[in-house]
Amino acid sequence: MKEPKVQVGILFEPQIKFILLTPYHINGEEVSGKQIVTYHNGHILWQGHSYDELLFEPLHEKSDAFELQDVTIGINFHWERKENQRFIGALKIIVENKKLTGINVIHVEDYLTSVISSEMSATASLELLKAHAVISRSWLLAGLSLPYSKDREKSNTTPEKVPYSTSSSPLLAQEAENKILIRWYERDAHTHFDVCADDHCQRYQGITRASTDMVRQAISATRGEVLMSEGTICDARFSKCCGGAFEEFQYCWENIRHPYLSKQRDSKKATDLPDLCKEAEAERWIRTSPEAFCNTKDKKVLSQVLNNYDQETTDFYRWKVEYEQEELSKLILKRSGIDYGQILDLVPVERGTSGRLVRLKIIGTKRTMIIGKELEIRRTLSPSHLYSSAFIIDKVNVTNGIPDRFILTGAGWGHGVGLCQIGAAVMGEQGYTYDTILLHYYIGATIDKLY
């Protein structure tokens, strides 16, 4: 198999400013320097001419570079901000949803060098970096083997399968009438490129985050290696902190069980895990701080996984959020577009194997509804995202059935499926090799070399 290329959606704006730092060619002409492209009447306006698509290809691939200005990172997360970013490879610009989309076309291994440096600190241990290289490559190539989402969405329209970004869908309206809103979010949102550059897919910030010799060594040592299960590349999901227990795929996304993404405790005693689908066990688990690889406050280890903006978060293994009644009711209205009135209760309906809520009943004075899955719950109950949906609810000062305040006590950061980045960092520090780390988180998988 030849090393493939990947198309990464970077920027989505009415106008894109960029600098070609080395010579590029387009339509047989050589160009460089500062450029501005603007959306105009369904087309791309560049240098006084109108285009349907632009493709700037490097004249010399080994020394190519361009810079995109005002790229938003951390979209809808608490660390959202803009920065200028540099990339290698080609730059494609297309029209999408009355805006312009800037797409980086790049070889997979070059893409991975950036992902590892963007997702994690470049000072991480070699074994951790090698493990992350394999899962990032696996996740990417598993997705590249599928058609773009426009074709896949057709098979996702059942009452339990609401595709990403369908707020005006007739199906969604039907679900609302039935007082159930179940939605999950996938890379299926991307129609004209393979992956985006933010946390919805994998963090990709080009060569903005300087890669080290260690990162390049990790990519080279694992070149072409992927996780496999039953002859198929694994959909190798990962999150920041599982909270001590692995979640299973079907509780977060489509109702399909992947055997390599199974429940397990994130510790040496991997089989010693309570049944966290049960409310009493989940509450006991979340209110305490069980031993786990990811239960650490070691700043040296955390700095390997958390970039500067991630380190703005200090509590992730166990955390707490409090809302006043008025604050919560307004927040839910703003985030969901549904007026529940005053919030009387938040009731767990279903939990996954890590204790994460899959379905949550919101009881209000005007409306009651069950929502899910985990990311929909996290988005509804936070101005950006709750750290996870593994939380329990305490009501404070209840008068005439109406609480003055809600306290959410939670566990972990992210969906908890697959590799736990903080847990893997601890394993690397404790001397575990990358293959041992991978097979701890992807149960029964194998590591195969594709190219």
Segments (PLM) and residue ranges:
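Conserved, single-site charged/polar hotspot
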Residues: 1-451
